[in-house]
Amino acid sequence: MYAIIATGGKQYKVSEGDIITIEKLGVEAGEKVTFDQVLVVGGDDLKVGDPTVAGATVEASVVKEGRAKKVIVYKYKRKTGYHKKNGHRQAFTQVKIEKING
């Protein structure tokens, strides 16, 4: 059985036991989270939402929170001496999918 969930402005295809990296939720490691925006529940019978499947949820537990590797942004304009260096680390949450209800 699989499901497609929407969280953090993105969509993820998940199955039970999967560990996925999503946008930061602000939840402690070990806590449970429930995703209510389930777009599709697949398996023996396919349920497609309009836009979400009524009554379907996905339960997960938080594995860890962290920050991704640093991405360097370097702006440069020739002949003017202008250059600017900037770094960014995106915060993320890793969750393990425990159960798909739907």
Curated annotation (Swiss-Prot):
GO BP terms, alphabetized: translation
Keywords for this protein: Ribonucleoprotein, Ribosomal protein, RNA-binding, rRNA-binding
Subunit structure: Part of the 50S ribosomal subunit. Contacts protein L20.
SUPFAM superfamilies in alphabetical order: L21p-like
PANTHER family: 50S RIBOSOMAL PROTEIN L21 (PTHR21349), LARGE RIBOSOMAL SUBUNIT PROTEIN BL21M (PTHR21349:SF0)
Pfam families, A to Z: Ribosomal_L21p
Protein name: Large ribosomal subunit protein bL21
